[in-house]
Swiss-Prot record:
[4Fe-4S] cluster binds at residues 78-79, 144, 174. It is found in: Cell membrane. This is NADH-quinone oxidoreductase subunit B. PANTHER family: NADH DEHYDROGENASE, NADH DEHYDROGENASE [UBIQUINONE] IRON-SULFUR PROTEIN 7, MITOCHONDRIAL. NDH-1 shuttles electrons from NADH, via FMN and iron-sulfur (Fe-S) centers, to quinones in the respiratory chain. The immediate electron acceptor for the enzyme in this species is believed to be ubiquinone. Couples the redox reaction to proton translocation (for every two electrons transferred, four hydrogen ions are translocated across the cytoplasmic membrane), and thus conserves the redox energy in a proton gradient.
Length: 200
């Protein structure tokens, strides 16, 4: 290391080193004459200064979950066709942060269940739900998913997904349009924003 004079640092006297460091400190002091705003000045005011964002950890976590839902698809019947249609370019599911439907429930936090659920398939729905990490949400799509639909009185059909797993949002219709499913996803987003993570 050398000084501006070109003299190696090892050949400098202590006075020369002190003068050099003093010059660095003085130039630093002259460049930093304006203090940063005292938090006491703006914390109690209406608006924080530009560039300062005040929030809670809970809101940041909910915000990140809101925009990065990873869905797993459990399509059983005709409603699944509308779900696939919703993922196409016309409705652009990517703007909600849901670009890719997950292949494994262990990577998903939203399960979209669409179609007619039979009692024979119900244990598999429960197993997939149990494999999802917390926090997790379930969206029941279609008349069959919400109440059993046309097949409600059949001996083999479950009269609604809520008989097997807890459901957060119901989407009525036979089959529901992609717009209705997008509205349900926005309802899930509202639920996520209100989720309490930290226990008091």
């Amino acid at each position: 290391m050398e000084l501006d004079s070109g003299k190696p640092l090892s050949l400098l006297t202590l006075d020369e080193i002190d003068q050099h460091e003093g010059g660095i400190i003085q130039s630093f002091r002259t460049g930093h004459t304006t203090p940063y705003p005292d938090p006491a000045d703006w914390l109690n005011s209406e608006e924080p200064p530009p560039g300062v964002f005040v929030t809670s950890v809970e809101k940041v976590l909910n915000w990140s979950r809101h925009y990065s839902l990873w869905p797993v698809m459990f399509g059983l019947a005709c409603c699944a066709i509308e779900m696939m249609c919703m993922a196409a370019s016309r409705w652009d599911l990517a703007r909600f942060g849901m670009d890719i439907f997950r292949a494994s429930p262990r990577q998903a936090d939203l399960m979209i269940v669409a179609g007619t659920l039979t009692w024979k398939m119900a244990p598999w729905l429960k197993r997939i739900y149990d494999q999802m990490p917390e926090p997790k949400w379930v969206l029941a799509m279609g008349a069959c998913g919400t109440s059993g639909g046309l097949f409600r009185d059949s001996y083999s059909v479950v009269p609604g997904f809520n008989m097997v797993v807890p459901v957060d949002v119901y989407v009525p219709g036979c089959p529901p349009r992609p717009e209705a499913l997008l509205r349900a996803i926005m309802d899930i987003h509202e639920k996520i924003d209100k989720t309490r993570i930290i226990k008091r």
